[in-house]
Amino acid sequence: MPVPKRRMSRSNTRSRRAQWKAALPTLVRCNNPACRQPKLPHVVCPNCGTYDRRPVLSS
């Protein structure tokens, strides 16, 4: 198996790790015309409890 020939310096390690960034979650508007709150896609709306305009959770 290949192994590194030299130890990677601290500055090279940190500059390589600087490219790793956390991505913001994608938000969409709820399909319920009465709600329209931002929510995660493909997830039941936590505000009104609907999914694809169908009531799923009873509030």
Swiss-Prot record:
* Region of interest (Disordered), ranges: 1-20
Q: Where is the signal peptide?
A: none
Q: Which GO terms describe its molecular function?
A: structural constituent of ribosome
Q: Which domain of life is it from?
A: Bacteria
Q: Name one GO cellular component term.
A: large ribosomal subunit
Checking Pfam families in the record gives:
Ribosomal_L32p
**InterPro entries according to UniProt:** Ribosomal_bL32, Ribosomal_bL32_bact, Ribosomal_zn-bd
**Keywords noted in UniProt:** Ribonucleoprotein, Ribosomal protein
GO biological process: one example: translation
Q: Where is composition skewed (Basic residues) in this entry?
A: 1-19
HAMAP family xrefs: Ribosomal_bL32 (MF_00340)
| Protein family according to the UniProt entry | Belongs to the bacterial ribosomal protein bL32 family.
Its recorded name reads Large ribosomal subunit protein bL32
